[in-house]
Amino acid sequence: GVVDILKGAAKDLAGHLASKVMNKI
């Protein structure tokens, strides 16, 4: 449902942010 879509989007955003942070280190 919508909640699952939001959860998936949140995970994608978290993954992108994490990768950006790791690249900076």
Curated annotation (Swiss-Prot):
The keyword rRNA-binding does not apply. It comes from the Eukaryota. It is found in: Secreted. Pfam families: Antimicrobial15. The modification Isoleucine amide is found at I25. GO terms for biological process: defense response to bacterium; symbiont-mediated hemolysis of host erythrocyte. One of its GO terms (cellular component) is extracellular region. Its main location: secreted. Expressed by the skin glands. Keywords: Amidation, Amphibian defense peptide, Antibiotic, Antimicrobial, Cytolysis, Hemolysis, Secreted. Has hemolytic and antibacterial activity. Belongs to the frog skin active peptide (FSAP) family. Ocellatin subfamily. This is Ocellatin-K1. It comes from Leptodactylus knudseni.
